[in-house]
Structures are given as structure tokens and as C-alpha cells.
């Protein structure tokens, strides 16, 4: 039990660092807004020049209080730790180390930023915490429904994309943001569920092959190939 809990905290801290790298090294320098708290903080940072980490902390205060009430003290504690780690890592990289953008090419920045953030969020979820913002709302919804976490986040991120388009006065940057968010949601699923797999099933039958093929297609939507053997 102790070993598992230590591993959970390692997931949370490492995920927080990856998320911070995605924001500071790829997205924020290129005015590309990711989703959730990080994306909203990037937008607000360009409206009022407070450090992104501070904005993230301010946005998450009411949501953390909600998590205490509805999601339990342990989850809330881990979420507070995660939010603090992200805020510290973001401002450490941006304000103290002065980390420069790894790429000014929008395609590379969007994809690698999305990969860093998606992997980071996946690790944070795997550790039993939330990065705050949309992820807390997603946790509330997914705990009561069968909707996937990534789907909820994708919907909520749309609001951030619209806000980014208005603030940055660029539809193109909003479109890049959508690509980054899509990449991050796919990485969340890969970390939590694993990479998608495909299987081949061989069915041997002496008769009724066409009927069997039709039944498989009608029930599963999967086509097949009939091979005659001797």
C-alpha cells in the first residue's frame, strides 16, 4: 500500500513537471492556449501581466474547495499538491530559469506542447489527483456517468479556445489550440488506458459462411474475409 501511494505521488509530481514544460517551452511563447486552467491562465496572463503560475493558483481555489466537499479529502489533498507543483514549476521555468521556447514553429510547438500536457495530465490522473480547473469538473462528471474524462475535458476546452481567439485576435491561433488539445486528450487516454490494440479472430466453419459473416457484421460492424481451405 505504501509503495503504491509513493508511486502515485511520483506520478503527480512528474506529471506536473511535464505539464509545466508544455506550457512554458511550447505553448505560452507561441500564444497557443491549451485547455483547462493552464490555457485560461495563458489567456489571462496576456490580459493582466501576472505570472502564469499565480493565475493558475487563483483560478483553482474555488474548485479545490468543491473537490473537498464532493470528491473526498484524499483527492483534494493530492489536487492541492498538484496545483502547487504546477504553479511552482511553471513560474520556476518561466520567471527564474527563463526557459526559452523550444520551438517557434507553430506545428511543432502545438504537437509537442499537446504531448507534454496530455502525458502530464494522464500521469496526474493515474496518481489519483487532478490538475484543477476542467479536470476537477471532469472528475465530478465521470464519477457519476460513463462519459470518458478526455471527452469532458475536450468540451470544456472549447470555451478556452473561444476565449483565446478573442484575446489573441486570431482565429488561426485558436485552430492551432484545437490541434494541441486534441493531441493532449489522446495522450491522456494512452496513459490511462494504454495504446489502442487490434485483434484478428479466425473462425473455422464447414458451412453457412456467408450467414456467419453477415451476423458478425450486423452485430459488431466488422467485416471479414472468407478463405476456402482444403
Predicted ranges, named:
Residues 1-209:
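Core subunits and conserved enzymes of cellular information-processing
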Residues 195-230:
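Peripheral (non-transmembrane) domains and long loops of multi-pass membrane proteins
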Amino acid at each position: 500500500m505504501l509503495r503504491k501511494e509513493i508511486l502515485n505521488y511520483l506520478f503527480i509530481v512528474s506529471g506536473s513537471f511535464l505539464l509545466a514544460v508544455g506550457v512554458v517551452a511550447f505553448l505560452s511563447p507561441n500564444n497557443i492556449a491549451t485547455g483547462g486552467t493552464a490555457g485560461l491562465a495563458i489567456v489571462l496572463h496576456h490580459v493582466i501581466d501576472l505570472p502564469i503560475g499565480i493565475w493558475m493558483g487563483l483560478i483553482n481555489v474555488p474548485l479545490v474547495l468543491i473537490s473537498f466537499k464532493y470528491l473526498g479529502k484524499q483527492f483534494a489533498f493530492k489536487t492541492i499538491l498538484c496545483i502547487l507543483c504546477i504553479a511552482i514549476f511553471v513560474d520556476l521555468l518561466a520567471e527564474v530559469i527563463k526557459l526559452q521556447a523550444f520551438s517557434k514553429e507553430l506545428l511543432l510547438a502545438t504537437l509537442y506542447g499537446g504531448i507534454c500536457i496530455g502525458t502530464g495530465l494522464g500521469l496526474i490522473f493515474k496518481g489519483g489527483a487532478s490538475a484543477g480547473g476542467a479536470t476537477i469538473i471532469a472528475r465530478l462528471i465521470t464519477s457519476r456517468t460513463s462519459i470518458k474524462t478526455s471527452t469532458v475535458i475536450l468540451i470544456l476546452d472549447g470555451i478556452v479556445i473561444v476565449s483565446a481567439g478573442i484575446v489573441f485576435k486570431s482565429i488561426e491561433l485558436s485552430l492551432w489550440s484545437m490541434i494541441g488539445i486534441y493531441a493532449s486528450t489522446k495522450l491522456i487516454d494512452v496513459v490511462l488506458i494504454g495504446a489502442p490494440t487490434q485483434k484478428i479472430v479466425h473462425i473455422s466453419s464447414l458451412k453457412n459462411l456467408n450467414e456467419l459473416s453477415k451476423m458478425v457484421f450486423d452485430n459488431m460492424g466488422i467485416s471479414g474475409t472468407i478463405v476456402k481451405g482444403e
